Amino acid sequence: MGTLYICPTPIGNLDDVSQRLIDVLNNVDLIYCEDTRRAKKLLNHFGIETGIESYFIGNEVNKIEDIKRHLENNLNLALISDAGTPLISDPGNKLVEIIIKEGFRVESIPGPSSVLVALTLSGFDISNFQFLGFIPKSGKEKSEFLTKLLNAQMPSVCFTSPKRVIKDLDYFEKNGLNSQITVCRELTKKFETIHRGDIKEVIEKLSSDNLKGEITLVIAPSELNTNVNFEVDSALKILLDNGVPKRDLAKAVSLITDIPTNEIYDKIKDF
């Protein structure tokens, strides 16, 4: 039985390719890629002659069956995306889920990720964070996305395009988001640009920037949210100090917030 290797590719700087990645791509029997043209440029740069096939959302169902058959025939395969780590807002989630459930071997090669690079450049406390993918273009999905940001207790990472980033941030600001934001453009490339500040400041900075390339946003929890959380924590501590059992308090808060009881209990058990 063969192995499927999850292989991250550079997000901008070819020097970020590891020797292990080169060895894997040289030695597998076939490489599945999001865009064959971009994959060829990468492989040619490193002198890798392994064959390639496309794998994207449009052909996913048929390709999964092909991949399963190849693995059953003891072929080793690699999955790469256009840039960064596959499955992170890229094709491959369904494939890996099925492959694992059916007992095939999967290995993940560590490597570049714009999500992690942006987080480490944000200047925020990133001991916890949430990744929200691409900002929806409009409608109910965008409203629900904003709600996640407004309710966030930790930094949020998301993607948008250069054409939409100012419009997206303007929408968030006009609908109540009061946060510090880090905007990362062209990460690891020659013209990497980082803008930091509150949402209004960042919009002003972007208005005078030559917006091209990939955009990764890191959005801190809303300042209003932070103040409210402090007040809620204080109230919980007062109730506990006055003899309310932790389990009972966790159940009551869970009923109000829809947050699972065990998560509430974990939060208050050390108060």
Where are these regions (language model features)?
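General beta-strand structural signal in soluble alpha/beta enzymes
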Residues: S108-G111, C158, V183
